[in-house]
Swiss-Prot record:
Keyword field: Cell membrane, Endoplasmic reticulum, Ion transport, Membrane, Transmembrane, Transmembrane helix, Transport, Zinc, Zinc transport
One annotated GO molecular function: zinc ion transmembrane transporter activity
Start and end residues of each stretch annotated as Disordered: 123-145
Protein name: Zinc transporter ZIP1
Residues in the Cytoplasmic compartment per record: 28-44, 102-158, 207-216, 273-281
Cellular compartment(s): Cell membrane; Endoplasmic reticulum membrane
Pfam families: Zip
Tissue and organ distribution: Highest levels in ovary, lower levels in intestine and gill, barely detected in kidney.
Native organism: Takifugu rubripes
Residues passing through the membrane, by range: 7-27, 45-65, 81-101, 159-179, 186-206, 217-237, 252-272, 282-302
Catalyzed chemical reaction(s): Zn(2+)(in) = Zn(2+)(out)
Length: 302
């Protein structure tokens, strides 16, 4: 048992440092943060982002949802909770709608604040006698749609929810290591998670850099995300020691919320933003498939 604990601690440290390395490449390299580059630069960034979208799509369908459904069904059968109601899917939908409602609240507050600031700006202009139109000035009605779309595409809230859902999933991946009882299984799962998480954190960092999040917060997100799998390993070790009866069921329910959150972020944030932007459509789809295929191959081999 002592040697098994040492193996788990080594896995904890390895996951932490490798995640930090791959996460800080997009965050610290100026090339990824340059939004005023050449057309070629913007195209390459867009293709990298499409690749990341394929990674997240694969993570959604081939990793997060299957893991959740397997865990929740195992727990329901173990507790002999038989029902015709699709409870696993309902829990996932609850996570989806939780993010949807929270985002609508945030957007509504932002729009109300923007409207208030607009009125505050217009009143002094009218008092100073500048009520006539300016032909060269921006038209609020015509530009509002574009501002709205851009905000939606790079919403810091959505980036945070992407970070949160991936962080929760990382905790559960760490739990899978912490709950193992044999050395070979710990090493096997750890290697699979190392490869998987390196690609995921790189893709997450690309998305965070492209959003309206300050660099310091991007670094904080990556640092916290890197800690999630080690935290999961520590929790798994603690659960094994404490032998909590309800632990696996609580884990499965939280996985369902994380899966629903991830479905929302993948299909309402990442894919629409990448595929609706103009230019190189077939090449974007190709890179989307490439990201998906690489993760699918890793899942197949793992």
């Amino acid at each position: 048992m002592e040697y098994l604990l040492q193996v788990k601690i080594a896995a904890l440290v390895g996951l932490l440092f490798l995640t930090l390395i791959f996460g800080f490449i997009p965050a610290r390299v100026k090339w990824f943060r340059d939004t005023d580059g050449t057309e070629t630069h913007r195209t390459v960034l867009s293709l990298i982002s499409c690749f990341a979208g394929g990674v997240f799509l694969s993570a959604c369908f081939l990793d997060i949802i299957p893991d959740y459904l397997s865990d929740i069904n195992t727990e329901l059968h173990a507790r002999q909770l038989e029902t015709s109601f699709p409870l696993p899917e309902f829990i996932m939908a609850a996570g989806f709608f939780t993010v949807l409602i929270l985002e609508r609240i945030v957007l509504n507050c932002k729009e109300m604040r923007a409207t208030h600031e607009e009125r505050t700006t217009l009143i002094p202009e009218r008092k100073s006698g500048h009520g006539h139109g300016h032909g060269d000035g921006p038209d609020p009605e015509s530009s509002g749609h574009h501002v709205h779309v851009d905000f939606q595409a790079h919403s810091p809230f959505r980036s945070f929810m992407l970070f949160l859902s991936l962080s929760l999933h990382s905790i559960f991946e760490g739990l899978a290591i912490g709950l193992q009882t044999t050395d070979p299984k710990v090493v096997e799962i750890c290697i699979a998670i190392l490869v998987h998480k390196s690609i995921i954190v790189f893709s997450l960092a690309v998305k965070l850099v492209q959003s309206a999040i300050p660099p310091l917060w991007v670094a904080a997100y990556i640092g916290v995300f890197a800690l999630m799998s080690p935290v999961g390993i520590a929790i798994g070790i603690s659960v094994m020691e404490a032998q909590l009866a309800a632990g696996p069921l609580i884990q499965a329910i939280l996985e369902g919320f994380a899966a629903g959150t991830f479905v929302y972020i993948t299909f309402l944030e990442i894919l629409p933003h990448e595929l609706n932007s103009p230019g190189k459509q077939l090449l974007k789809v190709l890179f989307l498939l490439l990201g998906f295929s690489i993760m699918a191959a890793l899942s197949f081999l793992g």
